[in-house]
């Protein structure tokens, strides 16, 4: 049957963003990213991925005579790729451009095998032709209908989609919903990596290259279990094999069936490996199943959401679905923003599904973010925007395209005055006092400093540059002087006999009483349950030091947990890992493993295996979790004073307090500085180390709040203050625990130091050790070399591969880690380092360095790692409930999409199928081959070695046999790590998208700290063409 021509006309009118052709039983859907006409790229690596969508009947938990995984319906959907160079792109046109000429690939829908009662499958696309906050329209297409092609362009058109034959990339992953079961079947070729998310309680990770399948129970502190812990899998992946994984739930039991086979020989292969896991009774039911896949060669990430149950009203579910299809990673924030933009009353039914905090702050949220700014802030923002618009030669074009800086001789009188006025405003709003100490430069000095910084950040967008122009160093006459007094580290001696300082001798002195006390402490600790939770800041503020010590009689009452430190000697024999898996996981007589009991067993075994979506073995950045205690720790500014050792030590101490449940209270750096026994004149000019930090606090038995004794580097020379009764003591009864000196580290009371030179032939062990410490204590202290390597203009956005030096001169902190792909196509890993040179230095005070650095370095960039060994005492930590009520919209960790792509990425230097033994080595630090970037000395290294990867994210929502699609294009995959990105801006008019995105970028710094940045941007925009809730 042929579709009427007028039917095509109606489609074109209603769906201006999509070009839909039906011919016989063929349906083609092409969607633009968020409604903008941005010349979506389709190159020779285009891939057509195939999906098996099964009937989703209502009899979901009942047994069926039908074979699990049998399919009723096959659909094939088109996928697009993003080439390495967007300049050489092939244009995909929307329906509004169909007259200009385009050809398309087809989507094939077959109806073979459908029962008489099976409803027609509807394919629809997330429409961008709606007003902000409106719901998506859906498009139904008869399976056997077609339209005349008379209105369609021919293949000879000058703007065809495929200008040449497009080779098909082998399909890696297919997935489909099971009929009559709550579950999915996933099939593909061995070597791929995918995830299955049973929303909202269980995540399944499948690294098929190594036949590794892991379960993560989100209801039980993210306890992760490997399916081989029950016993080795009989079905192993190898080159040329395919796999099938069936996941389904029956009667509160999660069933996994795993099978590998040669192509076309599935029926001849061995029996499947079967695993069963008992799921406890949970407040919220499973609502959907999501399958995450990636094709690194095609530059595509795909997310499929199979709806199995809706537990919220249709109106609210439609808003949440709209947020999902536009790529939002924090559905709840997008959901709240939409309600605000739509001006829904608090009595609306959807407000039952937002946080209580949002309800309380309803009126406050509707106030513009910038209303809290002082007049000088307004003027400074305007001045920065003016400078950025004039400093580039092509100021009339969009900012991101113009990177050619004007020459010094091009400075006119007006622009020179603008630069001088900018520095005066910066001096007024700066609280560090830097510009009070240094001489301000003239217009030429400011221009030279500014252009030097901009050249180091040539690839950054306007959001980043607006922040960089708040770095006070730009206004200093002799800018290289800015860093001179910021370095202040001297290495401690290794033993009392070699000690040249009183602090070293003091902390190396101990007696039998010390050892006995430490031994007793450790013995007691081994009998208690470890609980290293990040405690939310709102609860933390109710804690004070009076509740550090509770009645010993309450320890085993079952209602509380007590937090202790643990023995770091475990590293010497790796017992922290051996103890975890020394015996197989026990199952009941029916072969079922209880997930809740397993999670409790893990927590009792070791504190190191406290998993978190913001900090696990592959990725860690707790500052991304804005509800955590650690995220409340601010970036410090040490000023023109060499007290880096104090700031690195106090951050480490504060993260330990957070990890032990004490909450975050900012401690006074000035108190430590002024209670030093050194001469006042030497405190800023001569360096020291964390040993002195511990000595001072152990002697004084006191550490006040920052608000009690505020820091100013100009005051770092006063006498040690007298202690008013009103001051809070953060040190309390803290004890320094002794750790004996062994072959590869220095042990002092409360202090352990590892030098990387001792691990030169075993960096895997060093990396593993540091990761565990960061997981357990929140951070570690590091010694690094900064002279001739790091300056005021250092770009912290990328990853740097740098050598170290024999003698470090600066102390900082490792606060996280992760993986990346370098410009050579190698898989690498990085450390996330926090400095104390202000929020506007680096990347919001941080920077990233490659873990191993270049080849043939004499010294690693991390010279030494230090961590404290303290007994903070016992504290009362209420047990967490297994699930929070009214949490309807979960969010993944920021690294979720990146790690999905990373694990599917095949290094360009090695495409071979790796053996199972290779998995152990790759798992330690994620590196493929050694990098040889930069020079041996690591001098003047500013260029990032990280590869810029463009990504297309395809999102599919399958509900009631209907498929809705959304597309989001990212110019850099690192954008997927950000909670907010302007790439997700939605435009009502395709031609307005660039305008909407530019407005988002320009105004982002004004709205980023608002409770709802999307609502703030909408309020500032005033127009009706843009929807910012998806950012």
Swiss-Prot record:
| Signal peptide segment | 1-24
Which SMART domains does the UniProt entry name for this protein?
A: Pept_C1
What broad class describes the main subcellular location of this protein? other
Note down the stretches annotated as region Disordered.
91-163, 490-567
Top enzyme category = hydrolase
Query: Which species expresses this protein natively?
Result: Plasmodium falciparum (isolate 3D7)
**InterPro entries, A to Z:** Papain-like_cys_pep_sf, Pept_cys_AS, Peptidase_C1A, Peptidase_C1A_C
Q: Which PANTHER family match?
A: CYSTEINE PROTEASE FAMILY C1-RELATED
Does Transcription appear among the keywords? no
User: In what way is this protein post-translationally modified?
Assistant: Just prior to merozoite egress from host erythrocytes, proteolytically cleaved by SUB1 to generate the active 75kDa form.
Q: Where is the composition biased (Low complexity)?
A: 91-101, 140-158, 492-505, 554-564
Give the protein's biological function: Cysteine protease which plays an essential role in merozoite egress from host erythrocytes. May cleave host SPTB/beta spectrin and ANK1/ankyrin-1 which disrupts host erythrocyte actin cytoskeleton and leads to host erythrocyte cell membrane rupture.
Q: What UniProt keywords are attached to this protein's entry?
A: Glycoprotein, Hydrolase, Membrane, Protease, Signal, Thiol protease, Zymogen
| Top-level taxon of the source organism | Eukaryota
Q: Where is the composition biased (Basic and acidic residues)?
A: 511-535
Protein name stated in the entry: Serine-repeat antigen protein 6
Identify the catalytic residues: 644, 810, 835
What lineage is this protein's organism placed in?
Answer: Eukaryota, Sar, Alveolata, Apicomplexa, Aconoidasida
Site Cleavage — annotated at 95-96, 370-371, 927-928
Q: Which residues are glycosylated?
A: 74, 120, 449, 544, 573, 674, 929, 974
Matching entries from SUPFAM superfamilies are given as: Cysteine proteinases (SSF54001)
Compositional bias (Polar residues): 104-139
